[in-house]
C-alpha cells in the first residue's frame, strides 16, 4: 500500500526576487506540520540554496522556471526543486564539496560551492538527479520528541 501524503506544487520564474516566496511558503507548510523553529530555519536555508543554484546556473541568460513540490507526510517533509535548464558536471562539483579546513582563514574559503554542502548538512536526506536539467530532493523528518507536555500547568498568579 502506498504511503499517504499531500502534495503542494508551485512554479515560479527562475529569478532571485522570487526565491523568498518559496522560502516563506515552505516555512508556513513546515510550521503547520509541527516542525521545530530550528528545523524550519535549516530548511529555509536549504531551499534558498537549491533555488539560488537554479537561478545562477540553470538558465544562463534566459529566464526559465523553477518547479517546487512539497510532499507532506506524517513524519517528514519532502521538498523537490527542479529546473529544465543546463545541467552541470555533478561528479566534478561533488568532489569539491566540503568539509573545509577550519585552520584556514575565512578569506580562503571559496565564494561559491557551499550550497550543496549546506543543503547536505542541514537536511536529513538529499538526492540529486541530473538528467534533463537538475532535480534536488531534500527530506527533513519531524522531531516530535523535542518538547513534551508534562501536564503541570504554570500559574503567574501570586498567592499570599
Swiss-Prot record:
Chemical reaction(s) catalysed: L-seryl-[protein] + ATP = O-phospho-L-seryl-[protein] + ADP + H(+); L-threonyl-[protein] + ATP = O-phospho-L-threonyl-[protein] + ADP + H(+)
Top-level taxonomic group: Bacteria
SUPFAM superfamilies recorded: ATPase domain of HSP90 chaperone/DNA topoisomerase II/histidine kinase
Cell membrane listed as a keyword: no
TM regions (residue ranges): none
One Pfam family of this chain: HATPase_c_2
Keywords tagged on the record: ATP-binding, Kinase, Nucleotide-binding, Serine/threonine-protein kinase, Transferase
Keyword ATP-binding carried by entry: yes
Gene Ontology MF, one: protein serine kinase activity
CDD domains the UniProt entry points to: HATPase_RsbW-like
Stored InterPro entries: Anti-sigma-factor_SerPK, HATPase_C_sf, RsbW
Gene3D superfamilies per record: Histidine kinase-like ATPase, C-terminal domain
Enzyme Commission (EC) number: 2.7.11.1
Function summary: Negative regulator of sigma-B activity. Phosphorylates and inactivates its specific antagonist protein, RsbV. Upon phosphorylation of RsbV, RsbW is released and binds to sigma-B, thereby blocking its ability to form an RNA polymerase holoenzyme (E-sigma-B).
Alphabetized HAMAP family for the sequence: Anti_sigma_B (MF_00638)
NCBIfam families in UniProt: PRK04069.1, rsbW_low_gc
Protein family per UniProt: Belongs to the anti-sigma-factor family.
Protein name, UniProt field: Serine-protein kinase RsbW
Species whose genome carries this gene: Bacillus cereus (strain B4264)
Gene: rsbW
Amino acid at each position: 500500500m502506498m504511503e499517504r501524503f499531500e502534495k503542494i506544487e508551485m512554479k515560479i520564474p527562475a529569478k532571485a526576487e522570487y526565491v523568498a516566496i518559496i522560502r516563506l511558503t515552505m516555512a508556513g507548510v513546515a510550521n503547520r506540520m509541527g516542525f521545530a523553529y530550528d528545523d524550519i530555519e535549516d530548511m529555509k536555508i536549504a531551499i534558498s540554496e537549491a533555488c539560488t543554484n537554479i537561478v545562477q546556473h540553470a538558465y544562463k541568460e534566459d529566464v526559465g522556471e523553477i518547479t517546487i513540490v512539497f510532499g507532506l507526510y506524517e513524519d517528514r517533509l519532502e521538498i523537490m526543486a527542479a529546473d529544465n535548464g543546463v545541467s552541470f558536471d555533478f561528479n566534478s562539483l561533488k568532489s569539491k564539496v566540503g568539509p573545509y579546513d577550519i585552520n584556514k582563514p575565512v578569506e580562503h574559503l571559496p565564494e561559491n560551492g557551499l550550497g550543496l554542502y549546506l543543503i547536505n548538512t542541514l537536511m536529513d536526506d538529499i538526492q540529486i538527479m541530473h538528467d534533463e536539467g537538475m532535480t534536488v530532493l531534500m527530506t527533513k523528518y519531524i522531531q516530535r520528541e523535542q518538547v513534551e507536555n508534562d501536564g503541570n500547568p504554570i500559574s503567574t498568579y501570586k498567592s499570599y
